[in-house]
Amino acid sequence: MRYMTAGESHGKGLSVIIEGIPSGLIIDFDQVQREMTRRQGGYGRGRRMQIEQDAVDVRGGIRHGYTTGAPISLFIENKDHTHWTKVMQAEPLQEELERPRTLTRPRPGHADLVGGLKYGHRDLRDVLERSSARETAARVAVGAIAKQLLGQLGIDVFSHVRSIGGIDADFVNPMEYREVIEASPVRCADEAAAERMMAAIDQAKKDGDTLGGEVEVVVTDMMPGIGSFTQNETKLDSRIARAVISVNAMKAVGFGDGFDLARRKGSTVQDEILHDETGYFRKTNHLGGIEGGMSTGMPIRVQVAMKPIPTLYRPLQSVDIETKEPFVAQVERSDACAVPAAAVVLEAVVAVEIAAAVLEMFGTSTLDRLKQAVTAYREEVRLF
C-alpha cells in the first residue's frame, strides 16, 4: 500500500491516489467524513477552520460503496480558493495583480527560506503553499480508509494528548478513557489538566504566541510479527518513525516509555515474556509493543513531540530576500495550538503504516482472503 498527495494550501484542492487497497472493502463514507471533521477540530485552531468544511470526493477505485482493487483517487476542495483564484492560477498572468500576496520575508521555523534556496523561488509563496499543513487533510483521508481496513482485521488506532505548553496530563491508561478523550477539546484524558491546557492556549493567543505539545498514538489488538528484523526499511518502528516525523512540526518520536528508557537500567525496562492459553504475551509494555522491528502483540505506543507552530502574530526577526534588509517575518493566518488536530493526523499516518505492513506480510488482493489469512496466522502464533 502506498499513496501520493498533490495540491497547494490555497489552490483548487488536494488530490491523493492510494494504491494497494484490496477489493471488497465496504467504505463507510460517514466515518471518512467524521475523520475529516476531527482534524478540523481541537482547541486553539485558527479562522481557516471556519471556512473549510472538508469533504472527500471519490474519483476512482470505489464503486457502489466498495473498493475494486484499482487505485483510489480522492479530491478535497479548498473552499478558501475563491479568494485566491488569480494568485494561485496555473496559467500565466495577463495583468499585474492588485494584491499579489508575494512572500519575500521568510518565517523562522518554516520551509520558506530553505525551500526558496533549494528550488530557486524568489516568491516564497511557491514554498509555503505546498509545505503548509493543509496537506495533512489528504493524509487524514488516506488514514480514514486504512483505519477501516484495519478495523476489519480487529485492529484499532487512536490517539490522546499527553501535554500542551509544558502542562502534563497525569498518566492514565488511555484505552480506558476513550470517551473522555473524544469529548475533550484538547483530546486529553485528564480533565483537570485539559482545563489548564485550554487556559494556556488562550493566553498564548492573547500574546500572539503558539504552543506545542506531546501526543501518543496507540494501536491495539495487533498480531505479533508484523514488520521485520531483516532490513532497515522493513522494521515497523522505523516505518512509523519516518511517517510521523514527516508530519509538519513533529520533532521527536519515541516508543513505549520513550526517552525515559535511556535513564533506566536494562533489568527494569525489558518486557518479560509469559504464556497462557491465549499464547505469548508480555508482563509489561515498556518497549511499546515493538521488539526487533516487529510487533509483539502488545499495544503499540508511539509518542510524538510537536514544536509550537512557527507562524506568529508577533513575528520574529527575518531578512527580506530581495533587499537583504532586516524585517520581521511575514504574518500568515495560523493556529495558536494545533496539537489536538495533529493527534488526528498522527493517527492517520500510523494507521497507514500499520495497514501497509500487514498487506505486505499477507499479500492478498481481496479483503476476504486477507481476513482468512490474518485469522489463520493469529491461530498459528497462538499455538506456537
Swiss-Prot record:
The catalytic activity of this protein is classed by the Enzyme Commission as 4.2.3.5
Q: Where does NADP(+) bind?
A: R39, R45
Q: Does the keyword Phosphoprotein apply?
A: no
Query: Which GO biological process entries does UniProt record here?
Result: amino acid biosynthetic process; aromatic amino acid family biosynthetic process; chorismate biosynthetic process
What domain of life is recorded for the organism?
A: Bacteria
**UniProt-listed InterPro entries:** Chorismate_synth, Chorismate_synth_AroC_sf, Chorismate_synthase_CS
Tell me how the cofactor is bound.
Reduced FMN (FMNH(2)).
ATP-binding found in the keyword field: no
Segments forming a coiled coil: none
> What is an example of a GO molecular function annotated in this UniProt entry?
chorismate synthase activity
**Which cofactors go with this protein?**
FMNH2
Q: Which UniProt keywords apply?
A: Amino-acid biosynthesis, Aromatic amino acid biosynthesis, FAD, Flavoprotein, FMN, Lyase, NADP
Q: Per the record, what is one GO cellular component?
A: cytosol
**Annotated residues for binding of FMN:** R130, S131, S132, N248, A249, G292, K307, P308, I309, P310, T311, R333
User: Per its UniProt entry, what is the enzyme's top EC class, as one word?
Assistant: lyase
The protein's role, per its UniProt record: This reaction introduces a second double bond into the aromatic ring system.
Entry similarity comment: Belongs to the chorismate synthase family.
Which HAMAP family does the entry link to? Answer: Chorismate_synth (MF_00300)
**Subunit details for this protein?**
Homotetramer.
Q: What name does UniProt use for this protein?
A: Chorismate synthase
**Species name:** Exiguobacterium sibiricum (strain DSM 17290 / CCUG 55495 / CIP 109462 / JCM 13490 / 255-15)
Name the lineage. Bacteria, Bacillati, Bacillota, Bacilli, Bacillales
Q: What is this protein's gene name? A: aroC
